[in-house]
Structures are given as C-alpha cells and as structure tokens.
Regions:
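N-terminal positively charged helical leader segments and presequences
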Residues: 1-92
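RNA substrate-binding interface of SAM-dependent RNA methyltransferases
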Residues: 23, 92-171
Length: 171
C-alpha cells in the first residue's frame, strides 16, 4: 500500500531528507539557479541520482508550495512519512540505560516545534514525545523550522503525556 506524500521545502530540510536512508523521496523540484548554487557550494549532488528531479521556475515552485508563504529557497521535495516507532519499541531496542527525551504538551505552533526539534537534535537527545492530536506531522513550516534536524530525531506520538511520563519513570 502506497503511503500518502507531502511537501517539505528549503535547502537544509530537503538535503537532510535526501541523506536519510529511511526517508522515501518521491521527487524533488528545484530551479536551475538552485542547482548552480548547490554546485558552487560543493553540496553532494549525488543525492539526486536515484530520484526524479524536475526543474521548475520560482513562480512554479511558489504555486506548488501554496499560500503558506514559506521561503522554499528554490528546493522542494515530495516525501513519504517516516515509519513511526513506538516509545515502548524504542525503549526495548535501546541498549543504553539512559535515554534522554523531551516531552511537549499543548505546543502546537509548527515554528516553535521545529525550533525545539532543532535544539533537541543539537543536544543529541534520543527523541521527542508529543501528543498525537497536537502534532503537525506533515507541516512544511515545521520541517523548514527544524532545518532538517527532524530527520535525526525520533518522534514518539502518544495519546497521553502524563501516563507516558509515569511509564518512563517506572522503567
């Protein structure tokens, strides 16, 4: 069964998604100027080899991204959602005794969540616990705000934060 896809935008978000072996990229849209800029910056363009790449104008990318008014930086990718791992599975698979997690409750702004994800990844945290009802999992804005860090952090969606924290305390 084919998963649904969504768009992520921005240089860092798209390049990190391309580097993630667990992420399925359907296609990438970029401008000729962006391709030249990536070549000048010595970005590894081998990432684009096994992916459908479509060259578009900035106006076409603006239309593709919709009315979100997010700066796509000439680079957009259509991706599938990552496979979710449950917190219990992660705890069982994890070999180390100390697991460092951050829990968010009632944080719904995609920019704030993206910034928290970026900070959590920079501190090498193992994951982020979020309430599944309040997590904008397919938000272009969240992916862009995380600057691609979301590709390096486990996101655990739970129904009840309090019971999850009690479960973790008892482990």
């Amino acid at each position: 069964m084919k998963k649904t896809t969504f768009l992520i935008v921005g240089k860092h978000a798209v390049l990190e998604a391309l580097k993630n072996p667990n992420r399925n990229i359907e296609r990438v849209f970029l401008t000729e100027d962006t391709k030249k800029k990536l070549n000048r910056e010595n970005q590894n363009l081998n990432l684009f080899k096994k992916i459908n790449v479509f060259y578009k104008s900035r106006k076409e990318l603006d239309n593709l991204c919709g009315r979100d008014e997010i700066a796509h930086q000439g680079l957009v990718a259509e991706v599938e959602q990552l496979e979710d791992i449950t917190l219990k599975e992660f705890i069982l698979q994890n070999k180390k005794n100390d697991v460092n997690l951050i829990a968010l409750e009632e944080v719904t702004d995609p920019r704030n969540i993206g910034s928290i994800i970026r900070s959590a990844a920079s501190f090498n945290l193992d994951g982020l616990i979020v309430k599944e009802r309040h997590f904008p999992s397919e938000s272009k804005l969240m992916y862009k705000s995380s600057s691609g860090a979301i590709e390096h952090l486990n996101i655990f969606k739970v129904s009840n934060i309090n019971s999850t924290l009690k479960y973790l305390r008892d482990k």
